[in-house]
Amino acid sequence: LDKEPSTPDRTLISGASGMLLSGQVTVLTGASGSGKSVLLRVLAGLLPMSSGTVRLHDDTSSNVYHDMHETAPIRWRQQVALLAQHPQLLDGSVLENLQMPYQLYAHQSQTFDIDWHVAQLEHLDRSADFLQQDAKHLSGGERQLVNTLRLLQLSPKVLLLDEPTAALDIDTSTQLVNLLISWLRADAQRTLLWVTHDTKDIMPLANRHWHMQAGVLTADS
């Protein structure tokens, strides 16, 4: 795929080609401004491509792929989700923030599972009382944990991670990595594309390594 900026002086992504495999972690590295975040936003359907295509395999048939251009945006975003580096939470409790996606048309057919959240919080060394905390009083790490749980509960097939552990303390970073890897391993159809500058925690868990430089993607399988 290719992505041109609104001004013609620079190409943001040039001829990027790759395949994300189910059940795997793909780590994407590169210097700031190399195009990593732009690539994630294109894959998530949040930025248009100048040319090229993105296809998603239909797990009900080995020979069927869904093209992004031919798929309704709501349908695409049900299956491909982006976890941003800087979480945005609404005013209200943690519980209200977790319930918010189910008010959207794309997820009205899904059911909020509070027991799942209580179980996840237990793994994160937090009690169920955490659900009643005011979101505006959370630390940066706690906000990222809430933002992550809010996405994971929706069970996308492809999860795009834009430096999710940046600026987190060591303990919270470890908890977040463990949470994401556990979620991945719970369903063989899931895959992670993980953008990071700090590879020491995630690289040992990675199946593949992609690198981006000046908008050019290279893959090391």
Feature roles, as predicted:
Residues 29-31:
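The feature captures the beta-strand-to-loop junction immediately N-terminal to the Walker
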Residues 53-75:
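ABC ATPase NBD Q-loop/coupling interface
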